[in-house]
């Protein structure tokens, strides 16, 4: 109860006069006037005990909150009518109030956003101390009296207005503190740990998981018992059986029998003991045999490994390139050796030049299997992979438009050497080097012959090239050892051009070596190296040989023309042939690299073969009384295949003497020009 004098200046308009009443001395009956504001069902603050036992939700919203409040107020009115005292002790109300009613009151007092899990005793004590330190001692005493009166007014049965949202009200703090007392009346002051929301949610989730797990296990046990019970009492088992189990499993499908235990006799004990010992002895014997077999197997593997590495150490030198590789067929890890010519200047990419090193247990030897043909085992690859180049010469029959075989290159083949090649790994490496060399030679020949089709060169298939000349035909073919032409013609008689075919094959191989050396020189001299070879300038294998043969035919034809149009007409004339030397390139000047100098020297050793042939045919004409005519012809092949004739003629040494200096590429024009010179200048002068 409060009183307020508006004319008094010393009274606070907010607090008024505070009275302290003993609730135990007041026994006035509560007025039952329905028009009283205390009995209004629309009161904003209901008595705390009206929280509703059935509703455990913390916050009510909208119409539900209003309906709930009205029902609680009606219950409180009925409760208060049975009371004789006007004011009740707050402790008697809140101390015995259940948590499901007390917690919503605390949440409404604390305001929105407050969580009950964050409330603890230490925080309440701090709030009480903070309120005590804000005011003076006198003011605190007055406030205590006022608070005591407020408690009686707020908690009393008259339902005076109470602000439950006042967070600074110490009465609420004391009520909350009183609620935390245990059954013995002692306050739990030892709780220092504050549980966060995340910890609470985690523990709640763990608890639910354990509960669900226990429920599942108990359900399974119940299902098992129900199914087992259905065989005895079907109705009882079906009543406790789940619908799913009742649908899936037929009732009475599970049964159980009680088997009586019969103690074994002494004799059975002895027999069982003997049987156990027998099984143990048999297991020990089998384990012994298994260990002995494993030991023998490991010993054999270890011995094979020792032999393998000893052979590797004896057969492989420091110059060989050894590395690890995985077999394509079996996936087994093996050692591989590089036998190709990539480091020597080879640009062949169709064969990597790698062979797997395998230990042949049967022959106790090491076998080299090319990585590109690793499907072959043992020594089968010698007959299936080994290839060689063969050159055959065919001579044209004059009476018939046909050719006859007049020469064939011979392959070095010795049965004893082949057997040694399969046993010695060094011989196998040499054999593989020959194979890849022959394959690259055929590859470069086909690449060059693609530009020589207009000169009678044709590519019949991927392993055969044919060069046709007026009177001869050359056939270059890559064959394997099991080819029919090799097997069926091993005992052929020697032919007239066999030596020539062998020399031609040697020349082809030497020209490939020259290409290797030129590639190495380009790699050393150029910072980027030579990646692709230029067919016109770098690949010179067929053209030098073809140029030599065609140049010899051109020279014979030119001599025949000179004989017919000059020598036979001009008596006393003769012809002199002179080879024109090519100027040496100045490649070694200002070169400090010894490797380049050495390569240039080795390449110049093949100049006799690689240089474009040039011949000077000088015709010696008879001298006249006043004139000394000179006639000379220069024959050369600028691109190894075509012929170019350079003719010079001078009628005398005088300044006004007639002279000619012209070049022809057609022999018919040469005939006409020689006939013109002889008829107009040589015979006329002679006459």
Curated annotation (Swiss-Prot):
It is found in: Nucleus. InterPro entries: Mediator_Med17. GO terms for molecular function: DNA-binding transcription factor binding; RNA polymerase II complex recruiting activity; RNA polymerase II core promoter sequence-specific DNA binding; transcription coregulator activity. Residues 30-43 have a biased composition (Low complexity). Residues 30-70, 130-189 are annotated as: Disordered. The keyword Transcription regulation applies. One of its GO terms (biological process) is RNA polymerase II preinitiation complex assembly. It comes from the Eukaryota. Belongs to the Mediator complex subunit 17 family. Present with 1720 molecules/cell in log phase SD medium. Component of the Mediator complex, a coactivator involved in the regulated transcription of nearly all RNA polymerase II-dependent genes. Mediator functions as a bridge to convey information from gene-specific regulatory proteins to the basal RNA polymerase II transcription machinery. The Mediator complex, having a compact conformation in its free form, is recruited to promoters by direct interactions with regulatory proteins and serves for the assembly of a functional preinitiation complex with RNA polymerase II and the general transcription factors. This is Mediator of RNA polymerase II transcription subunit 17. It comes from Saccharomyces cerevisiae (strain ATCC 204508 / S288c) (Baker's yeast). The gene is SRB4.
